[in-house]
UniProtKB/Swiss-Prot annotation:
Annotated keywords: Complement pathway, Cytoplasmic vesicle, Disulfide bond, Fertilization, Glycoprotein, Immunity, Innate immunity, Membrane, Repeat, Signal, Sushi, Transmembrane, Transmembrane helix
Signal peptide: 1-32
Domain Sushi: 33-96, 97-159, 160-225, 226-285
Main location: membrane
Highest taxon of the lineage: Eukaryota
Membrane topology note: Single-pass type I membrane protein
Statement: the UniProt record of this protein carries the keyword Signal: yes
Disulfide bonds, paired cysteine numbers: C35-C80, C64-C94, C99-C141, C127-C157, C162-C210, C191-C223, C228-C270, C256-C283
Name of this protein: Membrane cofactor protein
Alphabetical list of InterPro entries matching this protein: CD46, Compl-Cell_Adhes-Reg, Sushi/SCR/CCP_sf, Sushi_SCR_CCP_dom
Organism this protein belongs to: Saguinus oedipus
Keyword Transmembrane on entry: yes
Subcellular location: Cytoplasmic vesicle, Secretory vesicle, Acrosome inner membrane
Length: 370
């Protein structure tokens, strides 16, 4: 009787690949029946930690992010559908939180930079003419915890006021009994009568006004006696600004006598330090040196009467020089030609004489030999 056969177990090396294949099949089937990570939004976020895969029918909940709040009863959850996609939803139910309304300041205006009071936006403030801003010019809508609040208190517009303008010696200004001046209020200065024979002159701007920064538009003027010396010019005379006394801003115009020209400005003005500005000019005699030829006419647009004559004389001189050179060249050429002709004729005559002498000598020698 044959012994019973043994049952052999499959080799582990063969079992491991089978288990791995089965696991892959199960994993693939489970992945194919799942959804990936749920969608993300600007205004909403998941209430739970996201997972890489979700089963069909699994549900996720959303809530508004910081700085947003629920505005409408829309869906705030999504479900993994049978086609392995998420049920579409929107973050429209969550809107930005807004800062409280700030009205226009009295005598001013509040301007929204982006037309909204939601956090992240700005509110600008400006004042009307005659008022200036006290406080911050720009406020920002910011998040403080979970609330939207402004970055500071709203400013106010206050009326522009100036203190009384300064008083001056030997003079006064209008509205001297007013203690406070408003925006663009103006005062005018004037000088008092002088105790002596010469009057006071007002040096500077006579009128100043209250500006937008609560200061006056300029310094106060000065009242003092300004008197310039009588202007004297040799070899010349005044033609305008005549007078016996010359006070502040007096203007004098000069001209020189015939045969003299002016050195300096022909117009001078008496300035605030009692001197002429620029200084009184001088009249200097016109030089008659032959090296300097004065033009007959200095009026622009009119020709010099001698200019045409000089130009015509220059042209005739050049023409005569050219003609003389041409005549000289012609004479030299003709003389050289005659000289060469004479040399040629003389050479021919000398040759003939020498040939005759040579023939006579030859005949004599022949006779002697015979």
């Amino acid at each position: 009787m044959a012994p019973p056969s043994r049952r052999e177990c499959p080799s582990p090396s063969w079992r491991f690949p089978g288990l791995l294949l089965a696991a892959l099949v199960l994993l693939r089937s489970s992945c194919s029946d799942a959804c990936g990570p749920p969608p993300t939004f600007e205004a909403m976020e998941l209430t739970s930690r996201p997972k890489p895969y979700y089963k069909v029918g699994e549900r996720v909940e959303y809530d508004c992010k910081k700085g947003y709040h629920h505005f409408a009863p829309f869906l705030t959850h999504s479900i993994c559908d049978r086609n392995h996609t998420w049920l579409p939803i929107s973050d429209e139910p969550c809107v930005r939180k807004v800062c409280h309304y700030i009205p226009n300041p009295l005598h001013g205006e509040a301007i929204l930079a982006n037309g909204s009071y939601s956090f992240g936006n700005q509110l600008h403030f400006i004042c009307n003419d005659g008022y200036y801003l006290i406080g911050k010019e720009i406020l920002y809508c910011e998040l403080k915890g979970s609330d939207a609040v402004w970055s500071g208190r709203p400013p106010i517009c206050q009326k522009i006021l100036c203190k009384p303008p300064p008083k001056i010696n030997n003079g006064k200004h209008t509205f001297s009994d007013v203690d406070v001046f408003e925006y663009l209020d103006a005062v005018t200065y004037s000088c008092d009568p002088a105790p002596g024979p010469d009057p006071f002159s007002l040096i500077g701007e006579s009128t100043i006004y209250c500006r937008d920064n609560s200061v006056w538009s300029g310094d106060a003027p000065e009242c003092k006696v300004v008197k310039c010396r009588f202007p004297v010019i040799e070899n010349g005379k005044q033609i305008a600004g005549f007078g016996k006394k010359f006070y502040y801003k007096a203007t004098v115009i000069f001209e020189c006598d015939e045969g003299f020209h002016i050195i300096g400005s022909d117009t001078i003005v008496c300035n605030s330090n009692s001197t002429w500005d620029p200084p009184v000019p001088k009249c200097v005699k016109v030089s008659t040196s032959p090296a300097t030829v004065s033009p007959t006419s200095s009026v622009p647009g009119y020709p010099n009467p001698d200019e045409g004559m000089l130009n015509s004389l220059d042209e005739w001189a050049i023409a005569l020089i050219v003609i003389a050179i041409l005549v000289g060249v012609a004479i030299i050429s003709f003389g050289l030609h005659r000289y060469l002709q004479r040399r040629k004729k003389k050479g021919k005559a000398d040759g003939t004489a020498e040939y005759a002498t040579y023939q006579s000598k030859s005949a004599t020698l022949a006779e002697q030999r015979s």
